[in-house]
Every structure is written in C-alpha cells, then in structure tokens.
Amino acid sequence: MPGKTPVIITCAVTGAIHTPSMSPHLPVTAGEIAAEAIAAAEAGAAIVHLHARDPEDGRPSQDPELFRRFLPQIKAACDVVINLTTGGAPTMGVEERLQPVLEFKPELASLNMGSMNFGLYEMLNRFTEFKHDWERPYLEESDDRIFRNTFRDIAHILSACAENRTRFEIECYDIGHLYTAAHF
C-alpha cells in the first residue's frame, strides 16, 4: 500500500486505574466487559486488552474465575486477539498479577517495563461521592504506593509464560522503560 501505513488498533476495555464512580460507562460485570470487547472488535480493534473487575463493587481483580466469565463470550463472538494484563492493578503483587495469564495462556499479554508511581490521588478533587468504600482509599493511598515491576519481576513473568508461547505487548511509560525493553 504505497503512502499508507498499516495500523493495529488495541482497545483497553476497562483497565485498573479508573474506579466505578469515575464513569457510569466503565464495564464491571462479565457481560459488560464482553459486550465492550466485542463492540471494539466490531468497530475495528484487532486486539482487546483485558482486566477483570469484581462484579459486586467494581474493584480490579486478577481472579481467574472472573476472567473465565467473559473470555468464552468474546472468543465465541469474534476473532479479536486477546491481550490479558500482567499489570493487574498497582495494589497487587506479581504472583497475583500472573494468575490469569498462566491459567488461560493467551496469545498476547501486557508486560510493564519498569516500576512507577501512579499518582491517582490527584483525581480525588474531581469527585465528591464514591459508589464503593474501596475507591477513596485506592486513590488517596496512591501517593505512597509503587507499582512494582523490577528486572527480577519482569524476568519472572517472561519465564513463567515461556511454556505458554504467550507474546508480550511491551508497556513503556517513560524513557527508562525503553532501555529495560532493550535489555530483555
């Protein structure tokens, strides 16, 4: 295609940064997550990046059972590439974050290239009321939380997923993460 650059569109359907009080459109239940992923594929997304949420309170979760509730629906409806998170949420340890990828062995998984600070506390002044009791502390306490992704953590994720033949979407949030990607 002369003069045209092919693109690959990825849709991150729910993520782990936002809380249910931030938007009534945040998919939380398995049905909502599946519907949004399928709609994204129908709109042209080649890849859907997926997190799970506790359907009772919208809290980010890496419980494989929650992923099991929406993955079959998506796979049955379309041939979009499934990209499961290994990032989970900033409050989770590496072993917890790995659970869905080890269980479902996706074609693609995200892989953060370094530790970072998610200063979510700055969003507090945008909201006066929260739907769930976990949301305010989740945001408030982010001023003293590190989203850990050390070289050892990254090597562990790569090693743990080697048998799966999972490929990785490399997530770089700053220039140092590019150097880490080059290292691996």
Role assignments for model-derived ranges:
Residues 1-25, 128-134:
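N-terminal small/glycine-rich loop or linker at the start of catalytic domains
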Residues 11, 59-84, 157, 161-163:
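Alpha-helix-loop-beta-strand connector modules within alpha/beta enzyme cores
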Residues 13-34, 86-94, 143-148:
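Active-site mouth loops of central-metabolism enzymes
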Residues 21, 46-69:
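Glycine-rich, proline-tolerant flexible connector loops at the mouths of alpha/beta enzymes
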Residues 33, 40, 51, 109, ...:
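Conserved, mostly hydrophobic/aromatic
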Residues 87-91, 99-178, 182-184:
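Conserved anion-binding
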